[in-house]
Structure formats: C-alpha cells, structure tokens
C-alpha cells in the first residue's frame, strides 16, 4: 500500500491531544531509492503482516570518571532503529522490497533507503535514511505462519523533523 492510499480521507490534526497507540504510527519507505524525486506519497507503508514495530532511539553515551566528582555520562548521539516482526505476506510491495534478493544479500548503499515515520493523529514525525538488515526472511514451525525479523538502522545524518503533507517530494 502506498502512503497516499493510506492517508486518503485522513486529515492529521496538528493540535491533537489524547492517548496514542502503536497503530497510530506510520512507517513508510522509498521502494525506488535509486530513482530521483520519488514522492513521499509513493513510499510503501510497512504494515501488512507486521505485528511488531519497535522504534528505538538507542542513545550513544560516553562515561568518564572524574576526581572527586565520580562518574559522569554524556550523551553524544542517537542511533535510530526500527525492529520489525510479523508474518510474511507475498504481494505486499513493502515486504516484497524488504525481502528481495537484492536487499537480503546486498551491502552498503544497496540496502539504504529513505523513510518517513510519523503519528497519523497529528502528522508529526521524522524523515531520514536507513540501512535495511534482514535477520530472518521466514521462520517458524510446521503449520505456522512464516515469520520475518527485520531491522532498519539510521545511516548518515540524523533524521529531520517531518510533518505529513500530501504529495511532497
């Protein structure tokens, strides 16, 4: 499903106030990162068959001990990551891209893509680049659904603030 399809009829409210569930977050990826000017509305939504989406900031810390002051910790950065778990669904554009031969066995820039991650209630989130790491493209016991385990990890510059707007390049 394309992001533009998901957002049809949805209008985020910038001043939304209330409880938020994990289902209120949208993760969409560029399925054609080698093509210039892919519209964000054409990104593939990562949702079909996904039971778990664990968004982490993974702080990077430096710990030092100083005379008469003891230990001090300083945050020097964050490593954004997304852990995806769920069941394989063939025919879903996002899953088919993530689990393609080129991504599973690719390295370097060959597994890098753009992403947006935002809250559907207020449209606010972030935009950046991630490396796709496929840990498992199908596992489970006889008679069970074929499970997948994938990580997206930030690469390059920190993500930038993003607010959803239809048809943005």
What are these regions (language model features)?
Residues 87-89:
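Solvent-exposed strand-to-loop "edge" motifs in beta-rich extracellular domains
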Residues 4-8, 14, 100, 150, ...:
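Polar/charged alpha-helical tracts
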Residues 126-169:
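Mixed-charge, glycine-accented linear interaction segment located at domain edges/termini
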Residues 95-127:
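Short, acidic/charged, Gly/Pro-enriched secondary-structure junctions
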Residues 14, 23, 41, 64, ...:
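Intrinsically disordered, low-complexity segments enriched in small/polar residues
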Residues 2-85, 129-145:
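Solvent-exposed edge beta-strands and adjacent loop segments
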Residues 81-85, 117, 149-153:
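Beta-strand secondary-structure signal
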